[in-house]
Amino acid sequence: MKSSQTLVYSIPRNVEKDTCAAAIKAYQYLISPPPSPIPNDKVASTVDVPKCSTIPESPKDSIVEPKPTATPVAQLHSKVYDLYRDSPKIWLRRERQWLQRHSPAYRFSTPAAKRPRRQPSSFLDVHASNTRKRGSPDTPDSGHSTPHSKGDVHPGMPQHNTRFKQSSREFSSNTQAIDVANTPYELLPDYSPDMSVLDKRSHPRPLRSEWKGPPLDLSNDENRHLLHPAELQLAATLRLPCLVYLDNKRRIFAEWHNRRTQGLSFRKTDAQRASRVDVNKASRLWKAFHDEGFFDD
């Protein structure tokens, strides 16, 4: 068997110190490469030495840009609203023509012109227009029926009868009542009581009422002679001129007479609807007349 030989370098003792240093330097070349002959300060400037790292850097995500294509890409843009905004009437006419052509069930008819409303010339015309009799519940009412064309009826839609039954009390009220709120003062019948009965009252101040603010001065009113002194005090307290007071008094008692003939009670809200003043002042008038018993049967 061959014995392994070990290479041993021995330095003689009689070698000088400089020789020993040179031998040690030569010995280092056996275990490491020789140093570069270029100085270290010049190596960085002349040679691009790659830096080593124990942790490899992660690759950066590269953004891939789409390559431009030579063929153009088709794009769709809506122009319906722009066309409608430029000419809405023409667009509507075209849509109607399309509906008439594809859907014959839809027919667009022009509305008939309304006849001008005839103004009442006298109290008899007003009374006749308000007391026009309606059809009975068993017979159709020709005055309130609305004609329908065949084009207005859509296929598949149920037909409903819009005629309603009417109670006997409502029928009697419609044939006898007068629209007090919309009737001129001169055409209203005067159902006001005789105010001379106020002189026989035991209390010194009949037709009492309260209102905020100072009373209205009616000393120079040209219609003050038509009012009782108690009525003058009531009108001044409510700050109503004499003519306004007379107008609302006649309307209140006309409405009271209409409801009494129908067998109905006369409430404060009924006086408010018939009057042409503030609802609070109408309530004060109703209370003043009610306290004196003018609404008693």
UniProtKB/Swiss-Prot annotation:
Domain SWIRM: 207-297
UniProt xrefs under Pfam families: SWIRM
Region feature Disordered, mapped onto this chain: 50-70, 109-173
Keyword vocabulary terms for this entry: Chromatin regulator, Nucleus, Repressor, Transcription, Transcription regulation
Location of this chain's protein in the cell: Nucleus
A single cellular component GO annotation: nucleus
PROSITE patterns: SWIRM
Molecular functions per Gene Ontology: chromatin binding; DNA binding; transcription coactivator activity
One GO-annotated biological process of the protein: transcription initiation-coupled chromatin remodeling
Disulfide bonds: none
Compositionally biased region (Polar residues): 159-173
PANTHER family with a match to the protein in the record: SWIRM DOMAIN-CONTAINING PROTEIN FUN19-RELATED (PTHR12374:SF21), TRANSCRIPTIONAL ADAPTOR 2 ADA2 -RELATED (PTHR12374)
Assembly notes: Component of the RPD3C(L) complex.
Function: Component of the RPD3C(L) histone deacetylase complex (HDAC) responsible for the deacetylation of lysine residues on the N-terminal part of the core histones (H2A, H2B, H3 and H4). Histone deacetylation gives a tag for epigenetic repression and plays an important role in transcriptional regulation, cell cycle progression and developmental events.
Name under which the protein is recorded: SWIRM domain-containing protein laf1
